[in-house]
Amino acid sequence: MKNTSPQPPVSKPRGSSLTRIVIWSQQLLCEVLEHGDLAVDLTAGTGQDTHVLAEAVGTEGQVVAFDLQAEALEKTTQRLQQHDFVVKNVPDDTEIKRAFGVYLVHACHSSVDKIITHPVKAIIANLGYLPGGDKSLVTRPD
């Protein structure tokens, strides 16, 4: 049976196309992820995506976020702690066991297969540079 309930008016999204795609990707992840899942943020940046993933997987889930810049991991830690998440920092060469919580790895996301050996439900990456950070550190294809 077709849903005939009134639909909210469709409005044109504001902001740049990049801003809209980030919001869309976060919404998609929230539709896919369930409490208890394992999710990965390949580029922690300011922690926005990491925070969305942590909310989506809940306290029973696990989020692993990577970044090359210590400044990015500090920003991510601050954002998550403001929302009462406990953050664990992991050395860049340590395999992460499947356990609850948010884990931050100071390493390139290219090491993901050495650090995470369990099935992952969702992965996100905002490639580029850290806003306000060192612009010489940018994700580029090999």
Where are these regions (language model features)?
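S-adenosyl-L-methionine
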Residues: M1-L38, H51, E55, E74-K121
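A general structural motif
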Residues: G36, E60, H118-V120
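Class I SAM-dependent methyltransferase core
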Residues: D41
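Conserved SAM-binding loop of SAM-dependent methyltransferases across substrates and taxa
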Residues: T46-E60
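Conserved SAM-binding motif I beta-strand of class I
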Residues: Q62-D67
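Conserved Rossmann-like nucleotide-cofactor binding loop
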Residues: E71
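Mobile active-site "lid"/loop adjacent to the S-adenosyl-L-methionine
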Residues: I124-D142
